[in-house]
Amino acid sequence: MGGYNVAVVGVTGMVGQMFINVLRERNFPVKNWKLLASARSADKKINIEGKDYAIEEAAPQAFEGIDFAFFSAGGDVSKELAPEAAKKGALVVDNSSAFRMDEDVPLVVPEVNPQAASNHKGLIANPNCSTIQMVVALQPLHREAGLKRVVVSTYQSVSGSGKEAVDELAEQSRAVLNNEEPTKKNIPYKGAKKNHQIAFNMVPHLDEFEEDDYTKEEMKMIRETRKIMGIPELPLTATTVRVPVFNGHSEALTVELNSPLSPQEAREAFSKEKGIVVMDDPSELLYPMPVLTEGRDEVYVGRIRYDRSVPYGLNLWVVADNIRKGAATNSVQIAELFIERQS
């Protein structure tokens, strides 16, 4: 029987579960599954295609004989175990931020820089969810007219903070509607010195603050985009906002270009990309929204129009399922690059 031995690390989380779904949906050639999580989840079972698989504790010895290892268990676990998995011969695709800016680790979005994956040393980093959908939309514009400057404001769903944040939004909504005091534990992030209500609210704060009062999330978008697109000095600024949406990240992009590009020419460029769906018909009130993109692997682009404040500029609205294209699907697509090269 052909196929590959596949490990999923962090299998009990939202992205870990989605790894399994996406691998199955895309008919990834899995010969054997190795499901890994923390010690507290060990010996629990997950059913895949009618067969129960026991979850094992993630440890170095678990990666013996593994061909592909998909990590989504947080940066600390990745720092400890991803190099061990690579040493044992696995190709590691890591969904944490642990290695993204490491010069020796490719940071890959297959629609944008597939060639970078070839330069790996056993480990490839999956970018931040909000970065992925942005660079997929930016790449055709850069190819057609060259990027001069990018401004992005994000509207990020609570699933980006994990299942507890999703449950908290649901419970807070119920509490507020019943005139009860909502419990606040997960926004802006678990362990913050102060937590905020997300139900019926927006919070302009994702992750910790860094220099110049930018958040880590904002700096991830800036640094990762420059690395992925190979434009180290690209002028780019970001404001990231958590919104009371369960799933799906949205972004308002203002893109200044080096040469003229009309909205129609941009639509045509986007339409040529297999990873992009153009949803842009104002006369029919048609534009991307999170409820339309949930469960889909493509990046949706709409509201494409001139930015009249600069000589060559466009505004656009970009939406994607952050658990799929922003995490699991992009990781699986990276692994598929290697299978395609072997076939």
Q: What feature does the model see in each segment?
A:
Residues 118-125, 201-212, 316-318:
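Helix-loop-beta segment of a Rossmann-like dinucleotide-binding subdomain
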Residues 122-133, 213-222, 326-330:
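A glycine-rich, Thr/Ser-enriched phosphate-binding loop motif common to dinucleotide/cofactor-binding enzymes
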